[in-house]
């Protein structure tokens, strides 16, 4: 299998079809990155993520599901060659990310395993529900916050900084490299929730904005009509992407939130009043056609592709 998220086909064939439904939990589904657990009057959300920014990913999943994160649990698998100082570095980084999003580490599991060649970190965020997770409905506008490719380009810069500096000034790197706070969607998600309007939310992450749009439509059972020209990407990110022939639309885009609602312009204005860039990028449509419009051509959105970051890690 390819590195990264497994395909929808594999998920359906080898995961979802084998799962029974037990207890008071939501059923796993495409585009649903957080589980809803209802027990004795408590509405709890749980979301898992892996990787160097796992805390942010897991907490973002809780936010996009209409909740607020309260704490995280972590699992750390260390290879036999790693020294104790490496474990300390991992814990310090997890704690630093927790400080950024305002949650604590409630517990976890740490083990040394001979079957890995580098540390593996998995995070599960646990939170409470602020509203019911909704599906998108035909006729709604699609609003996107911030810019695509922010988290992915951080990875590229981390691995290719010297090569980038051979062709581009350091100022380009500085402007392309997103601050940690830019990768968090909790603020805009809670602003959207407070409007008390019908609409879906989905955070972009691995697979980029194209994967996020596909997942949202697949979960909702709808089509899409997207204007590519309205999807915001920083010029500095474009310049770095061009150096390595990267497609920014399938590049990890953590920090970007998709929302659907009847009047997208109203949400855009509210976001901008709160210091968050946003734009209407298209509409939810009936049927299964998922169309991307560009200046030169129209195309159908296909199944999510492997994220471009796997060319660099």
How would you label these PLM feature ranges?
Residues 2-11, 272-313:
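Acidic, Ser/Thr/Pro-rich beta/coil linker or hinge segments at domain junctions
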Residues 2-144, 150:
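Glycine-rich phosphate/pyrophosphate-binding loop regions near the starts of catalytic domains
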Residues 26-29, 204-205, 223-232, 250-252, ...:
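Beta-strand->loop->alpha-helix junctions that form or flank phosphate-binding loops
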Residues 27-29, 37-39, 98, 113-118, ...:
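Solvent-exposed alpha-helices and their adjacent loops that cap or buttress functional pockets
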Residues 79-81, 177-253:
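Active-site-proximal betaalpha loop/short-helix elements
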Residues 130-180:
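Phosphate/diphosphate-binding glycine-rich loops and adjacent basic-rich segments that engage nucleotide
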Residues 254-260:
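A short beta-alpha structural unit
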Residues 260-266:
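Helix N-cap motif at beta-to-alpha junctions
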């Amino acid at each position: 299998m390819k590195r990264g998220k497994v395909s929808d086909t594999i998920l359906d064939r080898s995961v979802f079809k084998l799962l029974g439904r037990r207890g008071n939990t939501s059923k796993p589904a495409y585009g649903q990155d957080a589980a809803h657990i209802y027990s004795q009057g408590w509405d709890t959300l749980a979301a898992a993520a892996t990787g160097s920014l796992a805390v942010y990913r897991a907490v973002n999943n809780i936010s996009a599901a209409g909740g607020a994160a309260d704490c995280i649990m972590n699992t750390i698998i260390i290879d036999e060659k790693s020294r104790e100082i490496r474990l300390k570095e991992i814990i310090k980084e997890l704690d630093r990310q927790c400080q950024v999003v305002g949650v604590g580490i409630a517990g976890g599991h740490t083990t040394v395993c001979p079957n890995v060649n580098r540390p593996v970190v998995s995070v599960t965020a646990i939170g409470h529900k602020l509203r019911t997770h909704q599906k998108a409905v035909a006729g709604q506008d699609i609003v996107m916050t911030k810019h695509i490719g922010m988290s992915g380009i951080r990875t590229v810069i981390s691995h290719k900084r010297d090569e980038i500096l051979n062709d581009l000034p350091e100022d380009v790197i500085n402007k392309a490299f997103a601050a940690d706070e830019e990768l968090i969607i909790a603020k805009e998600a809670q602003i959207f929730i407070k409007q008390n309007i019908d609409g879906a939310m989905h955070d972009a992450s691995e697979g980029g904005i194209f994967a996020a749009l596909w997942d949202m439509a697949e979960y909702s059972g709808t089509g899409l009509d997207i204007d590519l020209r309205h999807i915001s990407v920083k010029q500095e990110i474009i310049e770095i992407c061009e150096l390595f022939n990267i497609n920014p639309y399938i590049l990890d885009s953590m920090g970007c939130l998709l929302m659907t609602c009847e009047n997208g312009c109203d949400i855009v204005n509210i976001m901008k009043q709160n210091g968050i860039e946003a734009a209407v990028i298209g509409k939810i449509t009936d049927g299964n056609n998922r169309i991307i419009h560009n200046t030169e051509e129209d195309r159908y959105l296909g199944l999510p592709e492997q994220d471009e970051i796997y060319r660099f890690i």
